[in-house]
Amino acid sequence: MKKLFALVATLMLSVSAYAAQFKEGEHYQVLKTPASSSPVVNEFFSFYCPHCNTFEPIIAQLKQQLPEGAKFQKNHVSFMGGNMGQAMSKAYATMIALEVEDKMVPVMFNRIHTLRKPPKDEQELRQIFLDEGIDAAKFDAAYNGFAVDSMVRRFDKQFQDSGLTGVPAVVVNNRYLVQGQSVKSLDEYFDLVNYLLTLK
C-alpha cells in the first residue's frame, strides 16, 4: 500500500512539474472544440506536405512514448494536392481499411518527396498499391466503399471543426494544439504531449 501511495504521489508531482513547465499560449493552444471523453492524440497531415514527411520519424517515436490507454489517430487532410487532394485522403483511408498503413505510408511519402513522382491521377494512385502487392479487387472494393468515404469526411470535418489552417498539426484530447516550436528537445516534446493527455 505504501508503494502505491508513493507511486500516486510521484505521478502527481510529475503532473505538477509539467504544469509549471508548460504554459498555454506558449507551448499549446486551447481550441474551441469539446474535449474528448478518452485520451487521444490526433495528427493532421497530408502526403503532399514536405514538413509532414520530415515529421514522420518524430511521430513514430511519439507513438512509443504514449501512456497505456492513450489512442493515436492519423488524419489525412484534402486541401493540399490540388485535384488529387481528395483522392489521396481516400488512399490513406484505404490503407487503414486494408490494414496496410505501416507498409504504404512510407511508400507514398517516398514516392512524392524522394522520387518526386506524385501520382497524376487515380489510376496511377491505384497502381502504387498494386506494385506493393495489394490485391486489385480488395483495393477497388475498399477505395470505392462507404467506409473509406466516411473516413475521409471525418478527417476533413475534424480538421475544419478544430479551426486549423495548416499541417502537420498535433491535437491532444481534441482540444489542445501542440505548439512544437516552443520546445527545445524531442524529450520535452513528448513530455508536453503526455502532459496535455492529463488535461480535460
From Swiss-Prot:
One of its GO terms (cellular component) is outer membrane-bounded periplasmic space. Gene3D superfamilies: Glutaredoxin. Residues 1-19 form the signal peptide. Pfam families: DSBA (PF01323). One of its GO terms (molecular function) is protein disulfide isomerase activity. Keywords: Disulfide bond, Periplasm, Redox-active center, Signal, Virulence. It is found in: Periplasm. Belongs to the thioredoxin family. DsbA subfamily. This is Thiol:disulfide interchange protein DsbA. The gene is dsbA.
